Amino acid sequence: LVLTDCLGLDREYVTSMRGALPATRFAVEAYVRFVVEQPLVIAVASSLTELFAPSIHRERIAGMLANYDFVNDDVMAYFKRRLSQAPRDASFALEFIKTNARTREMQEACVDAVRFKCNVLWAQLDALYLAYVQGMVPPGAYKPE
């Protein structure tokens, strides 16, 4: 919310999710359903995308600070915290999986969970690109002025 506040978006509008891209809403709902319905070890495995978060966040923080004068360190605080939190989260998840995914079948299901999460993330990126780079914003989704 700090980032959307900085962007000048109305907080009630943001939290209502009225302007969310349909693909983003669908992807988030699919991911939540996935982690609720799967065995704990598989749900935890899906979080291993966090292994790559620090390098991605470092790049995004630098880009945002360099290219947008309205973005400052306070706005980037969440992402900066993730630089140290994400490796701890991923390390915990990896140890949990190594301890609890005892069969080949369970280990393969854990790998599939990471693939699923990557697909969820790609679906969101595709939707963002189509809407805000190609200009094909779906009806009802946020449309920058």
Segments (PLM) and residue ranges:
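Long amphipathic all-alpha helical oligomerization modules
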Residues: 79, 83, 87-111
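Generic structural signal for well-ordered, non-transmembrane alpha-helical segments
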Residues: 1, 5, 22, 51-55, ...
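Acidic, carboxylate-rich catalytic segments that either coordinate divalent cations
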Residues: 104-145
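A short secondary-structure junction motif
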Residues: 60, 64, 93-96, 100, ...
